[in-house]
A protein has these predicted regions:
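Domain-scale signature associated with acetyltransferase and cell-envelope carbohydrate enzymes
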Residues: 5-148, 169-175, 182, 192, ...
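Short helix-loop boundary/capping segments
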Residues: 147, 152-158
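Flexible glycine-rich beta->alpha loop in the catalytic core of nucleotide-sugar glycosyltransferases
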Residues: 153, 200-201, 207-208
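A short acidic, glycine-rich active-site loop
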Residues: 162-170
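Conserved beta-strand->loop/alpha-helix structural units within folded catalytic cores of enzymes
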Residues: 179-180, 198
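A generic "structured core" feature
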Residues: 185, 195-197, 201
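Short beta-to-alpha loop/turn elements within the nucleotide-binding domains of ABC transporters
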Residues: 188
Length: 274
């Protein structure tokens, strides 16, 4: 279905029915494929498709996973989207997932790319998985970011005559908010509720740090501060927006009651807008 705001957006790509049907029946078990849980939108190239897709969700329904829609409304499809799956490669969806237009997904032999439930990725996102990439539930990653678990080439250290592994796993925690044009490389791990500043490069295990609700940023990224939480509740967000609209000189809004976020609003967003 096309939501109301889509009617006013000329660059919203159409669902590609033939490729949608082909991908579902090519990569999913027949009893799952008939439900057409994956929708492909806009121009997309399908390469090889020798792996498999698993959907680990109690409820599997039509279009719960949407790839290639235009969610951000500042660019159109450029025809560069592709899905490449080598033999014995696996993509796992643990629930609903949305990926914007102009995406690239490449999963190599024996590699596993896993998406948590209700995850969202902006346009021009790039996934290159040669080992294992796991992205936590409710995580959001903005446009033009890339998650790559390999250096692609070995590097010789002439100081100690050693050569490190060129690939390694990536594990992104639940409820992460990753800014645009972020690069996430092998060995990266983040805690639940992490915020990543735009244009950052993550390349290490941040779960070893004691601080929770971390804000990371920089090249390479480091801990900037902690104790910051993105607000997901639509109701609270509107209250704050109204406050600042009515109080032009105020810099901060004070939450006077214990802060309890409503993560169900993420589910609502998926159902009403996705």
């Amino acid at each position: 279905e096309m939501c109301i705001r889509d009617r006013f957006h000329l660059n919203q790509p159409w669902i590609r029915f033939i490729k949608t049907i082909y991908l579902n029946f090519k990569l999913l078990p027949w009893n799952i494929a008939v439900k057409l849980p994956i929708y492909l939108y806009g121009p997309v190239n399908l390469y090889w498709l020798k792996g498999k897709i698993e959907i680990k969700s109690n409820k599997i329904y039509r279009g719960m996973i949407k790839l290639g829609r235009n969610y951000e409304y500042f660019n159109g499809s450029d025809g560069s989207s592709f899905i490449y799956m080598s033999p014995k490669s696996t993509i796992i969806f643990n629930g609903p997932c949305a990926i914007g237009n102009n995406y690239k997904i490449r999963v190599e032999t024996n590699a596993i790319l896993e998406f948590g439930e209700y995850t969202f990725f902006g346009s021009s996102i790039k996934f290159i998985c040669t080992d294992k990439i796991k992205i936590g539930h409710y995580t959001r990653c903005a446009y033009e970011s890339q998650i790559i678990d390999t250096n692609s080439h070995f590097v010789y250290n002439e100081k100690n005559n050693k050569v490190a592994r060129k690939k390694g796993s990536i594990e992104i925690g639940d409820f992460n908010w990753i800014g645009n044009r972020t690069t996430i490389t092998k060995g990266t791990k983040t805690k639940e509720g992490t915020i990543v500043c735009a244009n950052s490069t993550l390349n290490k295990d941040f779960t070893k740090l004691e601080e929770n609700h971390q804000m990371l940023g920089g090249i390479p990224a480091k801990l900037i501060t902690s104790g910051l939480k993105r607000i997901f509740s639509t109701k609270i967000d509107k209250q704050i927006e109204q406050y600042f609209s009515s109080n032009k000189d105020e810099e901060f809004y004070t939450i006077k009651t214990p802060f309890i976020d409503n993560y169900n609003d993420i589910i609502y967003w998926f159902k009403k807008i996705m």
